[in-house]
């Protein structure tokens, strides 16, 4: 990829001038100027998704300049390089090929003179055979009973992706109970162990390196606990499986080779749900539905790769986000799925965005002088309306939002979904248009009890949002939605000249934590850290009588 400072492009300078021309224009004015704004500022994807970006503080000229910015940053070349398997993760010297995992036409993808699609197909067949044997009951535990429960042990991408998908597609769930242990917190393990029968439970240890401290600490405890409780040394070989790249370490841990489902170093952790790391997804919804999930992502991949920039959904949404973070200086973006099945989506996207683009060093190794990644947060609607929407409507901070809803609900109870949709539409309209006209906004009303109350009930509007309208939540539509966000994040990283596929920012905390951990066992008082950390460590020891 080209290492271009975006602020030095011609488009960026034009955008700065353009910003001063449009910053005081209200969204309602854009609609008045263009009676076809909805049609002109929305894109259909296949027959199951519509992205409406008309309620943004942008004009056609804004988009034109943003497209020019993308071209000056050689975005098209970067996209092609990712799909071709070029090394774009420079700090780890790796290609980035999660798109290969959902290459449903099985086109050749050559890496180091090897067609990696052959390896992917072999692993998919293994996943298919294993998952079907668990689901149909032919796989037996150590006492000859079929499996009823699956425990996925993993953190970060080895947890958030699979958990988000299994929740989102719960309507497709079979009889198996899926549990997740992610945190290194004894409470989490204890609560899961209360729910399972060891005779009918399998454990999936999901860690790319098979060395993640939280995951391996939890796996070690469960390994010893299960053998102790069952008094059967062979329990481990019948009930424990590894999802990893580091096969040697998994074998040394005690996992049988045939119980290892592998993925590769060119699959980033937060993109690993498409790989064997998503085995818990397959066990929850079945292999055919998992294939549909992959197909949905593949459809978005093809759209991203082949669609012209003016109709390319991930590119458009990425550029609008850059417009807000760097010209309006917004600091957060919110994700609001109006469907309970998508309740984990904001947390999942929080990791996807912030671990990918939460960087302050550019691809030239220099400190950036522009904004990179907003803070991502969100909640399901309508719960959020009764929590923090007050700030969105009347606060001093502008928060660009994505609203997501299916037109067809899986659970038709009375007129609930119509009411849910009404709230969805009301929020996007109210945020955009408010409830008063510009003349009243600019008036200095004389004090009266009536005016006093009126001022507190005003909604100025002009708060931007995107509406993502799904026909229905299915494996295909969900796959497309997740891939859309993946590519949006990639586009932002390319244009903002940062590396989106590493996460060095998490390493320092791990190193310091290991050092502190070793000192927690020493009886003498600690004085090798700052006074705050020392005080907290010594109080911990006092309360625990160490």
Swiss-Prot record:
E.C. numbers: 5.3.1.9
InterPro entries (alphabetical): G6P_Isomerase, G6P_Isomerase_C, Phosphoglucose_isomerase_CS, SIS_dom_sf, SIS_PGI_1, SIS_PGI_2
Gene Ontology process terms (BP): gluconeogenesis; glucose 6-phosphate metabolic process; glycolytic process
Substrates-to-products reaction catalysed: alpha-D-glucose 6-phosphate = beta-D-fructose 6-phosphate
Protein keywords: Cytoplasm, Gluconeogenesis, Glycolysis, Isomerase
Active site: 355, 386, 510
Main location: cytoplasm
Superkingdom assignment: Bacteria
Subcellular location: Cytoplasm
Stated family: Belongs to the GPI family.
Protein purpose: Catalyzes the reversible isomerization of glucose-6-phosphate to fructose-6-phosphate.
Protein name: Glucose-6-phosphate isomerase
Source organism per UniProt: Buchnera aphidicola subsp. Cinara cedri (strain Cc)
